[in-house]
Amino acid sequence: MHFIEKEPPQKRIDFDEKLKSNKILRVPGAYNPLTAKLIEEIGYDAVYVSGGVMANDLGFPDIGLTTLQDVSTRSYLISRVTNLPTIVDIDTGFKSCKETIETFEQFGISAVHLEDQIERKRCGHLDNKELISTDAMVKKIQECVSAKKDKNFKIIARSDAKSVEGIDKMIERCKAYIDAGAEIVFPEALSDEKDFEKVRKELSCYLLANMTEFGKSKLFNYKELEQLGYNIVIYPVTTQRLAMKNVEDGLRDIYANGHQNNIIDKMQTRKRLYELVDYEKYNSLDEKIYNFSTEGHE
């Protein structure tokens, strides 16, 4: 029980309605369900599940080693704890686009994005990527569109072609992807304002901007992206990077000093954690569950 009010069809309707507004949607990545709850509490528009983050969390590099089961199971666990729509990175489609779309739709996801790299893919902000043909990607998109049952389930086409074939060829690909049924385009690894402006000028669909750190793209304020005409901005790896840096620093401090007294102020308190997991609400099941005070646990 997660005390969630909205069922998946309503989340998809919400996502569709948000896209039709004139406001850009701000969408951080969640690497676990608890992070998704925090994203909703703070007031963001949706939750994103990154394929790279899923791979990293399993101890793998982002080179296509995760399976449909790996990503769909984690995505389901994330999406079921929030009233927000969830967008999932499905990499290159996990061999069967039909099975992949059916799985993610059944698991309550609102949108997925599919990329045009070869199966042994890599992070979109690395060099020497290899692409499948435009025709092959078009067929994948068509298979995705045909497989979905809910008209509000969104197919997002990601193109990694800019750094391989140039921005003009990437735009040509994206136009073909739109014609194939993609409602949103994700032009990966754009460099600067000129790139973002050019893509917006040439494409008439909804556009997604990727503001990942340590990559090829300039990091814009969301208001700048909104002015450039973009509809969604994702922060795919941000929460994992924040968490892992803090965990590493804390573990090193404990190892060096033999105690955690120096880093208590960097930790989430017991009281705050219990607020985030709705501990008190579980008294609706049994009044003995939350029969204590968190005073002094700040």
Q: How would you name each of these model-derived features?
A:
Residues H2-Y235, L242-R252, I289-H297:
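Alpha/beta enzyme core
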Residues Y235-E298:
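Conserved alpha/beta catalytic core and glycan-binding cleft of carbohydrate-active enzymes
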